[in-house]
């Protein structure tokens, strides 16, 4: 992603110097936005997966503690 960001900024400064047409800059900006959206979606998915795993672990701990309590009460 960093490479693409650098490429975008380099192209943008090339455009500001009058060497690039507006349509190609617009296409490059759209491509950059799409990459950012993909990265955001992946980060959300990774976070959701991590939270699911932590919840499963918490449930396992609670269930094992309940079993210990049941054994003590008997």
From Swiss-Prot:
Superkingdom of this protein's organism: Viruses
Coiled coil in keyword set: yes
Cystine residue pairs: none
Chain segments annotated as coiled-coil in the UniProt record: 19-73
Keyword set, alphabetical order: Coiled coil, Host-virus interaction, Inhibition of host DNA replication by virus, Modulation of host cell cycle by virus
UniProt keyword Lyase present: no
Annotated function: Targets the host DNA sliding clamp and inhibits host DNA replication.
Protein name as it appears in the record: Gene product 168
């Amino acid at each position: 992603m960093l490479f693409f960001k650098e490429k975008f900024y380099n192209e943008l400064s090339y455009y500001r110097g009058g060497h690039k047409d507006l349509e190609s800059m617009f296409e490059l900006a759209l491509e950059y936005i799409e990459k950012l959206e993909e990265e955001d979606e992946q980060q959300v998915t990774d976070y959701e997966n991590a939270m699911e795993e932590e919840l499963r672990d918490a449930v396992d701990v609670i269930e094992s503690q309940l079993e210990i309590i049941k054994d003590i009460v008997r």
